[in-house]
Amino acid sequence: GLGDVYKRQLFGTYQIAANGVAQSIWSLAALAGVAMGPVFITVIGQCMGNGDADAAEHYFKRLTRITLLISSAWNLLIFLLTPFFMKFYALQPETKRLVIWLVLIHNVFNAAAYPFSGALSNGLRAAGDVKFTMYVSVISTIAVRLLLSWLLGIVLKMGVIGIAIAMVCDWSIRAVIFFWRQKSGKWKTFQVI
């Protein structure tokens, strides 16, 4: 459709192809961090439901360490397997190089920032800190991801690399804010039903 024509004019076919392949690989890489989200919800929710903020604090730390470890190992494995995954696609060398860069950018930050911006934020929500996490996520998506995507991807002509950088900047900012929020203990003041 018209949107596809517009995207091809903005980024070019090889960038669109690389982005499509990279996103398929990203979905595999994201599994470790995403899988830990419900663990945070269950464990932190149980602790807070029992009125045991100290246990919740303990499990926040423990689950965050576990998530970082699992995410790091899994993202490294997926990155190392990327050349194998690309064999399933008919890609030009230029496109393959771009896929490698996109997966590298994603996986480094998926291992380092997403455990805080994703899984840890689920724990905050389970503790009743729902509005804060929602506002931060919405504002960060608009102010960081959208604006940086436009600035880096289109204005500075970085293409899909710029958009990937905008995405990981969004994760990184959320990670810092949610880590600070968890450390502040403010989440302990909410009533969980």
Give names to the regions the model predicted.
Residues 34-37, 106-126, 132-142, 148, ...:
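Short runs within selected transmembrane alpha-helices of multi-pass transporters and secretion channels
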Residues 82-83, 145, 149:
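Alpha-helical transmembrane segments of polytopic integral membrane proteins
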Residues 8-27, 94-100, 129, 163-165:
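Interfacial/gating helices of multi-pass transporter permease domains
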Residues 44-110, 153-193:
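Short alpha-helical transmembrane segments in multi-pass integral membrane proteins
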Residues 10-13, 50, 126-128, 157:
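Helix-loop interface residues and adjacent transmembrane-helix termini in multi-pass membrane transporters
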